[in-house]
Amino acid sequence: SQIPLYYLDMIWHLPDRTNVFREEFDMQLQEILAKDRWIIDGNYLRTMEARIAACDTIFLLDYPVELCLEGVEERIGKPRTDMPWVETEFDEEFRQWILDFPEEQLPKIYELLEKYSGRGKEIMIFRKREEAEEFLQGREER
């Protein structure tokens, strides 16, 4: 794709495993949102509404918790383009965040999607990796 891709984790996290200040994160995000075209990867519920308001297409990966946990396990020890360090173990705080996600985060995300549905936004929800992969494969074939 010729559309620039931004990972929110790369903006928020620093290589020394600390974070940027919230104001710095927000400033960088606003600079991205001001561009004509972009793809943003990441949850960050605090800034989600601004991103939804500014975009034309939303992809929600509403995967089962078990699949999310497996995905994190598989990535341990591997370099990633979306993180500024290599995870050496499963962070327990992150594990708990994943376990709590369906009750604490997901309802708020669906509320935002409902709020913005019918406003010219294309909203795509994938519940299995295969669904997302099929969609992306179909885009590549065009």
Locate predicted features.
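NTP-dependent small-molecule kinase module
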Residues: 100-142
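A glycine- and Lys/Arg-enriched "phosphate-lid" helix/loop adjacent to the NTP-binding pocket
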Residues: 63-105
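A conserved segment at the C-terminal end of the G1
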Residues: 1-4
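Conserved nucleotide-sensing/catalytic segment adjacent to the nucleotide-binding pocket
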Residues: 6-58, 63
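Short, charged, surface-exposed secondary-structure boundary motifs
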Residues: 15-19, 67-74, 134-136
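Short alpha-helical
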Residues: 46-47, 67, 104, 131
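A structural signal for well-ordered alpha-helical scaffolds and beta->alpha junctions
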Residues: 22, 26, 91, 102-110
